[in-house]
Amino acid sequence: NLLLCVLGQMGETFQTKMNKVLFYIDFLSFRERGLAISGLAYQALEFGPVPQRWDRGYSAFDDIEQQTKLVQEQECISLLSMGQADMSDFSPAEMAVIDEVCRKMRPMSSRAFSQMSHDEPAWKEHVGKPETIPFMDAFSLVNI
């Protein structure tokens, strides 16, 4: 339902950008409320923080359509919502976090957003390591 909510606010979104949006939603939520929203764990991969097993995650949702597109001679997968999010699943505090991240990230390109995530100590300290990024690193976020 979080994916549908984000796609409802942002429209068609590439996987690369969605990975970072989910990271920022969960880590900002943890910093502000002590709880993440999605229940996902994140790893610091070469191109930024991503949900663990993200490559399998998006295909598990019937309401999310994936389309392969060629962008600057590179294959990218875009995500499209085929349904509506049930907004009653989210508390007002959760919606405030989701809204803040989507509002800030919506106008950014996937590439710019990826570069921004590379400024985060949470990514820098864990890139290339097999462990997940600890949620305590939410307190070191610099871009939100």
Predicted regions and their residues:
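Domain-edge interaction signal
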Residues: N1-I144
